[in-house]
Amino acid sequence: MSMFLDTAKVSVQAGRGGDGMVAFRREKYVPNGGPWGGDGGKGGSVIFKVDEGLRTLMDFRYNRKFKAKSGEKGMTKGMHGRGSEDLIISVPQGTTVRDAETGKVLTDLVEHGQEFVVAKGGRGGRGNIRFATPRNPAPEIAENGEPGEERQLELELKILADVGLVGFPSVGKSTLLSVVSSAKPKIGAYHFTTIVPNLGMVRTKSGESFAMADLPGLIKGASQGVGLGTQFLRHIERTRVILHVIDMSATEGRDPYEDYVAINKELEAYNLRLMERPQIIVANKMDMPGAKEQLQRFKEQLAVQYDDFDELPMIFPISSLAHQGLDSLLEATAELLAKTDDFLLYDEADFAEDEAYYGFASEEKAFEISRADDAAWVLSGEKLERLFVMTNLERDESIMKFARQLRGMGVDEALRERGAKDGDIVRIGKFEFEFVD
């Protein structure tokens, strides 16, 4: 089984905030002591952090559920509960995180040590010391902790490489990478020897260095899923320069120029922006019989494609096996990299507006009313449900406070307008109460 994994689906759940406490001072010589219940601690958030030592999402193959710890409950003497530590999850450089439900990109993690909160922990509930007023100096009110955010996420790894090698299978991409770097890709005399991307660091004789990625071979129709399809082409999206490797020996009966055109069509079909990247044509296997004649014919065909105003791509004849022409290729690649800017995969507008967000947008609909099959009125809505779960239903004063909040939101009036009558059942989740007109 391959140990390389570049996509994963995970679920994350932040910790719930600790419940606030209802407590009163019980001290000698202090009659009728006031409220003394502290707030609950915050729940732990779930945070993704980039680890440059990771190269794959393999850790997420079997471990797909992550849950941070909840905060501790508030205590007497006005002491707050302990907040929970955040859950830090390491991901490799180049990990894109999407919300699985909306498909929206949350973040693109590319820098070592970069962090992003994917699920924010709930705040602790307030203790009764927070609700004291001149009219009610000893309130028996405390809030439950706020639930932590839950999310289903899709992770996609697009490896960070400056240069990407593309071409048909068996044109010598892996051999080239193994010769110019310390990478040890699998090499064989058959198609699709490379079934996962390989990454190597290249250093030129002039001292320049860059990362080079060898991708599994493409064939005609890859954009429609033929062969290995384009499942690994995502890894070329971050590259700044493409080395298009072509077998000039034509030993398998293929035409080098037709190969060149076919691969570019597949790149364009996958992502139009790939064609914005500068290409260097690598004419490989020049030590084979007939390669020089094929190269001359290739240049003539290429010249026909470009008019007088277009600049022909650079062509470097090499032999990876014989170590011929490699130095000039690498120097030219380094020079091209030096004058080529990074290609941003995502604009700021592509990202979700916020990290895990718990406020209520002003335009958010506060609640919705529907009718159940048993004729009960059902209240729903994010804001209303959050207020409900933070209400301590074991305390009458907390329930009365929640009733006032519903009235302030306009729930009572809305129920009347919908035809609710005295004694009708109103339901929030599994909790039921009677409507009083």
From Swiss-Prot:
Residues 2-160 form the Obg domain. GTP binds at residues 167-174, 192-196, 214-217, 284-287, 319-321. This is GTPase Obg. GO terms for cellular component: cytoplasm. InterPro entries: G_OBG, GTP-bd, GTP-bd_Obg/CgtA, GTP-bd_prot_GTP1/OBG_C_sf, GTP1-OBG_CS, GTP1_OBG_dom, GTP1_OBG_dom_sf, OBG_GTPase. GO terms for molecular function: GTP binding; GTPase activity; magnesium ion binding. Residues 161-338 form the OBG-type G domain. Its EC number is 3.6.5.-. Its cofactor is Mg(2+).
